[in-house]
Regions:
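Cysteine-centered metal-binding/redox modules
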Residues: 1-125
Length: 125
């Protein structure tokens, strides 16, 4: 799970190449760096609930914490995909999409519709 953020973003394919991910102590490039506490709200919430990631939460679809309140619909779509299909299928699907020419994650950040993102991912299963 080290390469998947609590919110569902996949660190291996992130365009912030210097970032070591939110599961690392060095948060200088991660979303956590935006907060005075240097802690991502999604990571804090997961830790408080004892969750590996937001995809384990029963409130995911309605959640407005962290990435999910900032219009990051791609992150929520990723978490919903992981919830339904698991993190291994998620990683494999990203690899298939990249091989087809998709620019992950940048291209998906431009899509505001969660279901549209899910449809693209599910078309590769």
């Amino acid at each position: 799970m080290q390469n998947i953020g609590y919110c569902g973003n996949h660190c291996t394919y992130c365009f912030f190449t210097a970032c070591k991910g939110c599961r690392n102590e060095d948060v200088c490039y991660s979303y956590a760096a935006l907060f005075d506490s240097k802690k991502c709200p999604n990571a804090v919430c997961c830790a408080a609930k004892g969750l590996i990631g937001c995809w384990e939460c029963d409130n995911l679809e309605k959640c407005q914490i962290g990435f999910y309140c900032s219009g990051e619909n791609d992150a929520k779509a990723y978490a919903l995909f992981i919830k339904k299909y698991g993190h291994k299928t998620y990683t494999q699907t990203i690899e298939k999409l990249i091989a087809k020419g998709y620019d992950y994650p940048k291209q998906f950040k431009e899509i505001s519709d969660i279901q549209e993102i899910l449809n693209i991912f599910e078309s590769e299963i």
